[in-house]
Amino acid sequence: MRRVLLSVASIVFVSAVGSAQQFTYYFPQIAVGGGWTTTIFVSNATAGATGTATIIFTKSDGTPFKSNWLDEKGNDLTKGGNAIAVQLASGESRKFTSVGDASLTTGFATVFANSSAVLSNAMFTQFDGNGNVIAEAGVPMAIPLLKQALFVDTTNGIRTGVAIANPNVVSLPVQFQLLNDTGQVIASTTVQFGASQQMAFFLDQLFPNVPAMVGRLQFSATNPMTSVALRFNPPGIPFTTLSPLALAN
């Protein structure tokens, strides 16, 4: 089940961070192989101006995520590397799909764009042994947050999964607090999060002795992170994504 969580990605909150020349977005979860593919759509909503985007893929352990990605015409854009660079005319949209012909590998993606109007979404697809689609989830790109929360629901056998990416070049101590439906903190812990790395877990792995509940998991660090929650119905398929909430520091 943990491999399923590691295979689906990322945040459901859209925004941008950048200077006058560059805007940076993230997909905090990317899955390639083992019955999974990731598709990234990019569009230039700028009126009358060319948009550019560079997508850098990083593995969960912080090393370059080298894989093959095909465009909508079947051209291999990465050729075993870990970057896609694209120019888009005004109104143009592109599609990039990972080639899932190896064992499962996961990580996250960083998108550098020349405009806040160059926007993107990701779609994560799971296949059975015969190549049939059995589940999909789509999420938009996101910016990191210093303090955030994810809704939790573990009633009726449902499992809540969490995936977090640390896009910073420094290791972070992350403080987790689990709040019940009345807002009371019922469990807490601190986890060290490596630089440029990613972690994924089910709530019952982080807090194994907590009974079935509805509430929220909130967490914070000294540098911002990106996250997504995944709600898995028994026996783990189908699933859906849950958006993070930005909290006041």
Task: Enumerate the language-model features and the residues they cover.
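Positively charged n-region of N-terminal signal peptides that target proteins for export
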Residues: 1-4
